Amino acid sequence: MIQTIENRLINGGELTLEEALLLASSADKEALYEAAHRITRYFMGDKFDTCSIINAKSGNCPEDCKWCAQSRHYAASIEKYGLLSAAVCAEQAAYNRRQGIGRFSLVASGRTASMNEIRQMAESYRAIKQRTDIKCCASLGLLSEEKLQILFDNGVTTYHCNMETAPSFFPSLCSTHTQDEKLATIRAARRVGMRVCSGGIIGMGETMEQRIEFAFYLHSINVYSIPINILQPIPGTPLERTLPLSEEEYLTTVALFRLINPRAFLRFSGGRAQLSPAVQRKAIYIGINAAITGDLLTTTGSKAAEDMQLVRECGFQVTNDTDWEVSYDH
């Protein structure tokens, strides 16, 4: 079965839902991992994409996402502050570029950014572009096309908006906005000319079937940069007592995401520090070919130099030439 699926993918076909469910329950996980490895190398070669972020505005978010320490609905202990200055953002971007990182994103808490905040961040992006040639991304919540156009005009080429989890599971985790609102933001970003980055968090209590549903959903909306965060339960949030995924569950999820999205950059993201070095290497072997590196929001990230070495040891080349397609469904 694995060889049949692999041949079909190479010839332009797709994995079916029924096949994904069978692979998830198969006892021969190594065969699944090897197939995902070969598909990764066939479609994506040895390129590895890197990006970094700065938490440009922290805390006091009005949304009630159950996993998130930024929400003001919960009692998580995090630092809270307003927008960072353009000088601070530009300095961090230049520092990350010197470390060999290809992309840099401002990330801000909140449902959306006000027009005044958008103008302030446009100033930050202009300052970044004056300091360095790093590619600019943004993750600022649910934005209108008008606001996205301002960002695009000031150097932002990629917009990040995580769909977070399977459509069947999302309503149990967040009641203050919907995935349809996220999709509207993604489509607006594409209309102004931006690329899109959208993934989510695994290990929030969803089933393997829902992870597969999520992977197919991302495929259906043509996402080609997929951050795969691992829940790091944060004290004070509703998910603080959630049990961690097993290593096999995590690696199986990566393999299935690869077979369902063979042309995507699957990105190490938040919570990765929970994985052992051996599991991180195995994940890269199976299908991870991008990473957020540096300090990640309110969880512990991975330092750039260590990540660069890991990527090279796993047979990949860190490169800035990793653009994905710009426009699909408007």
From Swiss-Prot:
Pathway connected to this protein: Cofactor biosynthesis; biotin biosynthesis; biotin from 7,8-diaminononanoate: step 2/2
Gene3D superfamilies: Aldolase class I
EC main group: transferase
Obligatory cofactor(s): [4Fe-4S] cluster; [2Fe-2S] cluster
Binding site for [2Fe-2S] cluster: S105, C137, C197, R267
InterPro entries registered for this protein in UniProt: Aldolase_TIM, BATS_dom, Biotin_synth/BioAB, Biotin_synthase, Elp3/MiaA/NifB-like_rSAM, rSAM
Catalytic activity: (4R,5S)-dethiobiotin + (sulfur carrier)-SH + 2 reduced [2Fe-2S]-[ferredoxin] + 2 S-adenosyl-L-methionine = (sulfur carrier)-H + biotin + 2 5'-deoxyadenosine + 2 L-methionine + 2 oxidized [2Fe-2S]-[ferredoxin]
UniProt-recorded Gene Ontology molecular function terms: 2 iron, 2 sulfur cluster binding; 4 iron, 4 sulfur cluster binding; biotin synthase activity; iron ion binding
Enzyme Commission number, as recorded: 2.8.1.6
Any one GO BP annotation for this protein: biotin biosynthetic process
Cofactor annotation remark: Binds 1 [4Fe-4S] cluster. The cluster is coordinated with 3 cysteines and an exchangeable S-adenosyl-L-methionine.
Signal peptide: none
TM stretches of this protein: none
Residues that bind [4Fe-4S] cluster: C61, C65, C68
Family annotation (PROSITE patterns): RADICAL_SAM
Residue span(s) of domain Radical SAM core: 43-272
Keywords for the protein's UniProt record, in alphabetical order: 2Fe-2S, 4Fe-4S, Biotin biosynthesis, Iron, Iron-sulfur, Metal-binding, S-adenosyl-L-methionine, Transferase
PANTHER family (UniProt xref): BIOTIN SYNTHASE, BIOTIN SYNTHASE, MITOCHONDRIAL
Quaternary state and interactors: Homodimer.
NCBIfam families in the cross-refs: bioB
The protein's role, per its UniProt record: Catalyzes the conversion of dethiobiotin (DTB) to biotin by the insertion of a sulfur atom into dethiobiotin via a radical-based mechanism.
Similarity comment: family membership: Belongs to the radical SAM superfamily. Biotin synthase family.
Protein name: Biotin synthase
Native species: Porphyromonas gingivalis (strain ATCC BAA-308 / W83)
